Amino acid sequence: PLMLYAMGQTHALAQLQATHTIAMVGSRNPTPQGQINARDFARNLSASGLTIVSGLALGIDGAAHEGALLGAVMRNAAPTQLPTVAVVGTGLDRVYPRQHRDLAHQIAQQGLILSEYPLGTPPLRANFPKRNRLISGLSQATLVVEAALPSGSLITAKQALEQGRDVLAIPGSIHATQSKGCHWLIKQGAKLVESAQDVLEELQLPVWS
């Protein structure tokens, strides 16, 4: 983008490109297990030193941000280490969805909120798919936690591949609608991961214990 607006720990923005980062995306209407997986993966990856990038949406995004903040507590993160980055599709003065107002405040206190849209920009439907390229572009890899067919998360995965990033996916039940997108990605060559340790190994990073 021509311009990027930032709110939060902006002093750490310059170090973001040198930080190990992973995008975590998925359904806005996840299964209970998907919600748990997102939070647990994010917590353990954050505790291992990774920055979790997501989009502050309901469902998987929110759970990933929450897990990342918990993981930062576990590793006693230094002020220059960002636990999580939220890339939003509105102006920074608009929190969307409203249910994530408190979460957005926590992210601004400990991490970063980024937007390519100027202040005052409302939550326009077209903006959210556009911001997905920033979520994947800021990350070494994209992890799809749960996704139906079709899904905006698959757009993010496609953009990650176009940007030369790895795509990882968590499998689920063959009967679960919210796992069909992940299964499709795995068939297309995405790396199947069952734990945070699997993710670290795929990224060739030390396994946290």
Please provide the spans of the model-predicted regions:
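Glycine-biased, small-residue-rich flexible motifs in mid-sequence functional cores and linkers
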Residues: 1-209
